[in-house]
């Protein structure tokens, strides 16, 4: 059900004021019922300015594939935190102590080496396991729930025809985030984040100490929370003799992007803003497009900008100087 309620119109300070409310009831055989609502407002104090905001709940059930697609084997690339050359144990005493407790009695944690294909010591920060790991679905997944908030404005000044500018603030928090687990996440949670429950997802060879069995599935992470701003500026200039010119600049600034990969309450969020991770969370993304049209002809020029990023390199403890990228711009010409 959805309701749009006009409150005021054509008054000084309120050319338009309206409220919006919507709610949806869903019934799932696997998860029961859920009720999710959304509320919003629009306020136009003057003809050239529109202010709007929303608050909404969200719900996403796991797909059939997430729950029941079965399993398969794969030879994953990963970094063992206990590796004495590339792992976090090299420089982190707490990780080194946890590794010493987990490795077989005959293996010296100070000299332990992860093994790659061919059962030889790894020669890179991320190496392929010589033993197959198991990946697949998870019939214990539960639905994601979310809360989102937005607030913004659109400005279309009368003294500049065909000019529009909008700025929006947004914040989204997703609980029980469904993510694809990885060998790195599991091992890092066990040894670096000291989450004991995650250590049960794998075993080590009783003689060599290498990871000989690991199962990864989709999991419900603790939460993901993102916050940022969207800016959109556009202008069109029509002419009688030279065609129509246009310009549009869109930018997104991510002020916060936190991820907790476990429901463990004491785990601190992993701040992803400006740090390369799955999906690469650039702090700033920007696009500028210039266009021209005349009759059957047209041309456009686009440039994309991504702000500088520090990569969450798997070997950051060993090679920190290799974990940075400069600002990046990519032009695109079309005609």
Task: Enumerate the language-model features and the residues they cover.
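Gram-negative outer-membrane beta-barrel transporters
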Residues: 162-314
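Extracellular loop and loop/strand-boundary signature of outer-membrane beta-barrel proteins
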Residues: 22-27, 136-139, 215-220, 268-277, ...
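Outer-membrane beta-barrel signature, preferentially recognizing the C-terminal barrel domain
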Residues: 65-165, 214-229, 280-283
């Amino acid at each position: 059900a959805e309701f749009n309620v006009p409150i005021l119109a054509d008054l000084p300070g309120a050319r338009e004021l309206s409220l919006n409310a919507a709610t949806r009831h869903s019934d799932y055989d696997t998860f029961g019922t859920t009720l999710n609502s959304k509320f919003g407002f629009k306020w136009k104090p003057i003809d050239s300015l529109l202010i709007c905001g929303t608050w909404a709940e969200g719900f996403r059930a796991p797909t059939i594939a997430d729950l029941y697609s079965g399993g398969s084997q794969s030879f994953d690339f990963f970094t063992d935190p206990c590796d004495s050359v590339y792992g976090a144990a090299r420089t982190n005493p707490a990780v080194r102590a946890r590794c010493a407790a987990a490795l077989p009695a005959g293996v010296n944690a100070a000299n332990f080496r992860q093994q790659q294909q061919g059962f030889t010591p790894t020669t890179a920060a991320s190496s392929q396991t010589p033993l197959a790991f198991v990946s697949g679905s998870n019939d214990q997944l539960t639905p994601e729930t979310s809360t989102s908030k937005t607030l913004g404005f659109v400005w279309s000044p009368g003294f500049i025809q065909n000019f529009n500018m909008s700025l929006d603030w947004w914040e989204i928090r997703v609980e029980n985030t469904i993510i694809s687990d990885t060998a790195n996440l599991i091992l890092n949670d066990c040894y670096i984040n000291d989450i004991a429950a995650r250590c049960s997802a794998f075993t080590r060879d009783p003689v060599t100490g290498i990871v000989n069995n690991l199962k990864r599935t989709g999991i419900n992470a603790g939460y993901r929370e993102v916050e940022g701003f969207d800016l959109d500026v556009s202008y069109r200039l029509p002419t009688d003799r030279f065609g129509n010119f246009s310009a549009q600049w869109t930018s997104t600034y991510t002020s916060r992007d936190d991820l907790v990969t476990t429901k463990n309450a004491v785990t601190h969020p992993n701040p992803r803003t400006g740090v390369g991770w799955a999906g690469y969370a650039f702090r700033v993304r920007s696009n500028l497009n210039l266009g021209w049209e005349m009759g059957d002809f047209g041309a456009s020029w686009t440039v994309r900008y991504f702000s500088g990023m520090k990569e969450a390199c798997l070997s950051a403890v060993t090679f920190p100087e290799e974990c940075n990228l400069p600002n990046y711009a990519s032009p695109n010409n079309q005609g």
